[in-house]
Regions:
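Short, solvent-exposed mixed-charge patches
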Residues: 108-109
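Short gly/ser/thr-rich secondary-structure transition/capping motifs
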Residues: 21-23, 81-82
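Sec/Tat signal peptide C-region and signal peptidase I cleavage site
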Residues: 15-21
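Axial heme c-ligation environment in periplasmic c-type cytochrome domains
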Residues: 39, 45-59, 71-101
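Sequence/structural segment immediately N-terminal to covalent heme-attachment motifs in c-type
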Residues: 24-43
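Positively charged n-region of N-terminal signal peptides that target proteins for export
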Residues: 1-4
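Bacterial N-terminal signal peptides
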Residues: 6-15
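Stable alpha-helical elements in mature extracytoplasmic
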Residues: 24, 28, 65, 69, ...
Length: 109
């Protein structure tokens, strides 16, 4: 029984890590350029908007973070990181938004 539970736990870890790693750095950077994110955001420094590392740190442990951030990417908004509003990205596919948000949330400072 212990071996079954250990195997199940290992499988869940692999599945979870594979999902989080579904977007690598090169793919994320290409997506950021294609969708215009790189004009305001960088991985490790503030440009106009916060760095993705800052976003990941702010939302660490928040189970609602993926949904909150996906909504913010799609609809835009202001007041969370300063006065300059983030424009909406309504034409970016839901799959691309999810992949990018999931990747951002894996980053560490």
């Amino acid at each position: 029984m212990k071996f079954v539970l250990a195997g199940l736990a290992a499988a869940l870890l692999v599945i979870g890590n594979a999902e989080a790693a579904s977007l690598d750095m090169a793919a994320a950077e290409a997506m950021m350029k294609k969708d215009g994110c790189a004009a305001c955001h960088a991985v490790d420094k503030k440009i106009i908007g916060p760095s993705y590392q800052e976003v990941a740190a702010k939302y660490k442990g928040d189970k609602e973070a993926p949904a909150k951030l996906a909504k913010k990417v799609k609809e835009g908004g202001s007041g969370v990181w300063g006065q300059i509003p983030m424009p909406p990205n309504a034409t970016t596919s839901d799959a691309d938004v999810k992949a990018l948000v999931d990747w951002i949330l894996t980053l560490k400072k």
